[in-house]
């Protein structure tokens, strides 16, 4: 089972490609404020670098938090859009063993249908001054 993994709650974002529990590729890059611009290219390059296309991917595992509001929002939006577009099962996990747990859940046939963020606290959104 070929699985794409996505983790974007930190300044350094991570994507991976797995065949079951076996890591085929894993990349970390300093995405910071360019995450929305870079994540799609990084995923496409990861797949192409291993002679894989979307027809080969059978599921998506993503880290749902806690972490950066914006980083989680971007990463989960990309994961959900890919899941919907390619009709792939998606699972989201939030503990230190997120990757192993997510892969096990996919292999067991689980599908969250929609990966939701877990921020760990209220989002700090600036209130209007008036």
Sequence positions of predicted segments:
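Short glycine-rich anion-binding loops that position phosphate/pyrophosphate groups of nucleotides
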Residues: 11, 65-66
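DPxDG-like acidic metal-binding loop motif
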Residues: 59-64, 70-88
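A generic secondary-structure micro-motif detector
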Residues: 33, 68-69
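Oxyanion-binding and handling regions
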Residues: 1-44, 48-54, 88-130
